[in-house]
Amino acid sequence: MKLEKLRNLFGQLGIDGMLITSNTNVRYMTGFTGSAGLAVISGDKAAFITDFRYTEQAKVQVKGFEIIEHGGSLIQTTADTVESFGIKRLGFEQNSMTYGTYASYSAVISDAELVPVAESVEKLRLIKSSEEIKILEEAAKIADDAFRHILTFMKPGISEIAVANELEFYMRSQGADSSSFDMIVASGLRSSLPHGVASDKLIESGDLVTLDFGAYYKGYCSDITRTVAVGQPSDQLKEIYQVVFDAQALGVAHIKPGMTGKEADALTRDHIAAKGYGDYFGHSTGHGLGMEVHESPGLSVRSSAILEPGMVVTVEPGIYIPETGGVRIEDDIVITENGNRTITHSPKELIIL
């Protein structure tokens, strides 16, 4: 099914074959979870090329592809495969292949023109299958469980790094392969940093703590943000929290298929601006989510992407005021036929520990 969908794109891409080298797209197309392998796909043939270390693994995981073990030169074996498949215009992933690698392929592939392709497999990944959504739901559940656990762990005097370590350890104990990304734990004045990765700062009473994390599970990512208070926060921070809470709720309530990313972004941005905090919301409302934590479509002021059923996106408005603090709240949602469905379920009302 995936092979045929990719082949159906060949015409509009102006190619008759595709070289897939990025690990994420290789895994999506083949099911291979190792770190050394690529795929060559023509209109009627498909080969997966790897080395001795992964041949047996590939025979188990990769279906519908001829398994080829290269004898020492991956690039030469790839060139030989392209020639045997009769490919004349070979698409390659321009956003992931380095110039050096491109030059190496160009030196040995003589019978085919190398054609840069911006998006091929990524277009297929936009719409998730029911099986993919089930995995994403499980990744989201692991993150939800981790949030519930970390509420029992956080207290004044604990460092942000200790919180991040505990979150990752707990998610792994629940089946996650790893964290989806370098998680954010930003407390006190550091919560005004939208991407304030965990530091050695100690959490203090009265701090707001922004936790942005996710579980990487069976090749898919969850991505959740909650902001909690450790001790009583100031009235200003409570006000900011309520504005973000209401903006995020508007987004989750009204995002639906047929809407552009820009229209989805406006749902949260317009509310924050109306409350006087527009200058303090400087990032997009959300992004696509799947095998990578940041995928298309974007929910931003510049996005003309049309939301479709089966897409999975985040909704994560925030307010960040230097020398004061910040708040972000984020959920993962699946676009449905009539609206959307939330797959992260951690409480969003302000929690004061």
Curated annotation (Swiss-Prot):
Give the residues the record marks as binding Mn(2+) 1.
223, 287, 316, 330
Q: Which GO terms describe its biological process?
A: proteolysis
Residues bound to Mn(2+) 2: 212, 223, 330
On cofactor binding, the record's note says:
Binds 2 manganese ions per subunit.
Q: Which GO terms describe its molecular function?
A: metal ion binding; metalloaminopeptidase activity
| Alphabetical list of InterPro entries matching this protein | Creatin/AminoP/Spt16_N (IPR029149), Creatinase/aminopeptidase-like (IPR036005), Creatinase_N (IPR000587), Pept_M24 (IPR000994), Pept_M24_MAP (IPR001714), Peptidase_M24B (IPR050659), Peptidase_M24B_aminopep-P_CS (IPR001131)
Q: Which Gene3D superfamilies match?
A: Creatinase/methionine aminopeptidase superfamily, Creatinase/prolidase N-terminal domain
Record flagged with keyword Hydrolase: yes
Entry similarity comment: Belongs to the peptidase M24B family.
Which protein are we looking at? Uncharacterized peptidase YqhT
This chain's source organism reads: Bacillus subtilis (strain 168)
Upper lineage is: Bacteria, Bacillati, Bacillota, Bacilli, Bacillales
Name the encoding gene, please. yqhT
